Amino acid sequence: MFNKRAFEMVSNEQIKKSFGERYDYSNPDFRGGFKIRFSPRRATKYSAAYDLYSPIEVVLKPGEIAKIPTGFKIKMPHNEGFFIYIRSSLGTKDINLPAGVNIIDSDYYDNPDNEGHFFIAIKNNSEKEFKIEQGDRIAQGVFQRYYTCGDKPISIRMGGFGSSGK
């Protein structure tokens, strides 16, 4: 069991696989700059949530859903999850998370499919095009402890986004 929580960048290979041509890798120290600009972080000393940033520009047409790669994976204790919510400022513009909340389980970390690289699915429910700029805060995440009722797990995670239960 992990005792500490941490946001870690996924490998260069995973970043290139997830971002493709949507990110500029020309800077030899792109990892350092990426980490400084887009690492999840709390805005104030007592903020409960970590702000989550879009490393890429995305234009969402009305009704469109985009899966935005973050470039990060999350290490956390096995009795916790990382719960992702839309920023309230986006909710007032009719932009939301299709599932209401995205939940990252602790066993998502380092999964063989995508190293635990977490994405944020966002939907434009408005009737207008909506643009997310590179560096915009798009969501916020909270570490939350959970409890089980003693049931036995039926499988071990082997995949990435949307893989549990398959």
Regions found by a protein language model. Give the residues of each.
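DUTPase catalytic domain/fold
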Residues: 1-166
